[in-house]
């Protein structure tokens, strides 16, 4: 066995989003009080591990999620635009009606022609490509130790599908990537050996939000995705 290095992909915590907006890459969406507790739970759970490198998405919710862990480990996070949320033409819409949100807007139908790309947002191949490049850099920075990358649900899930050689086509509610979950990529030297999944803050997630495609902390039931 060679040198083992683990890169943890950490999804951000719950976001204060009372209008249930698909926020995507928009600025101004911060962690809710519950999201802050989730971030603190991460620091408490893995803060004593051999984590020597931390990088985050540029978006506020990701940086706020990584802050408690950075403080515990005495690390200065690297802000990496390669691990940002994926782009999406539906950004800014409220999805309280689920798929009906789009059905009611015929002008948006033209974006639905190809679920394999997908035609409504950043191509899956491009998401996986930029994420894997960031993972490799984090692995190299933490070789023989552990690293954490704070990112977002779709980039993390797309990366896992790529690493496990599975189809990118999926239903958003079937993603195994809850708030503040860890998708841990274990390397043997430069070879990926396995992918692990855990939910250190799983007990803090409201039952109805576990399979939500994005976070809507503070939203009424009608406005939640």
Task: Enumerate the language-model features and the residues they cover.
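Short glycine/proline- and acidic residue-enriched helix-loop micro-motifs
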Residues: 105-126, 219-224
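Active-site signature of alpha/beta-hydrolase-fold catalytic machinery across serine-
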Residues: 68, 158-162
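Generic beta-sheet signal
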Residues: 7, 145-153
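Loop-to-helix element that buttresses phosphate recognition and phosphoryl-transfer chemistry
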Residues: 11-65, 69, 120-132
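Short active-site segment of divalent metal-dependent hydrolases/proteases
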Residues: 15, 155-156
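Glycine-rich phosphate-binding loop signature in dinucleotide/nucleotide-binding domains
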Residues: 48-50, 138-145
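Acidic, low-complexity terminal tails and accessory targeting/binding regions
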Residues: 1-5, 78, 85-98, 145, ...
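Phosphate-coordination/substrate-recognition cap region in phosphate-metabolizing enzymes
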Residues: 41-108, 224
């Amino acid at each position: 066995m060679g040198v083992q290095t683990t890169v943890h992909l950490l999804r951000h915590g719950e976001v204060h989003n009372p209008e249930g907006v698909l926020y995507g890459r928009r600025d101004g969406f911060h962690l809710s009080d519950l999201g802050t507790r989730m971030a603190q739970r991460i620091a408490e759970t893995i803060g004593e591990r051999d984590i020597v490198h931390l990088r985050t998405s540029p978006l506020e919710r990701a940086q706020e999620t990584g802050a408690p862990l950075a403080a515990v480990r005495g690390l200065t996070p690297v802000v990496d635009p390669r691990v940002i949320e994926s782009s999406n033409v539906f950004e800014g819409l409220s999805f309280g009606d689920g798929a009906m949100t789009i059905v009611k807007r015929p002008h948006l139908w033209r974006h639905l022609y190809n679920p394999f790309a997908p035609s409504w947002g950043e191509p899956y191949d491009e998401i996986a490509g930029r994420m894997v490049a960031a993972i490799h850099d984090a692995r190299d920075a933490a070789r023989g130790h552990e690293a954490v990358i704070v990112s977002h649900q779709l980039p993390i899930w797309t990366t896992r599908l790529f690493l496990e050689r599975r189809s990118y086509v999926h239903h958003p509610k079937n993603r195994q990537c809850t708030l503040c979950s860890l998708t841990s990529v274990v390397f043997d030297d430069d070879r990926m050996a396995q992918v692990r999944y855990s939910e250190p803050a799983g007990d803090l997630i409201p039952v109805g939000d576990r399979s939500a495609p994005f976070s809507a902390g503070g939203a009424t039931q009608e406005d939640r995705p």
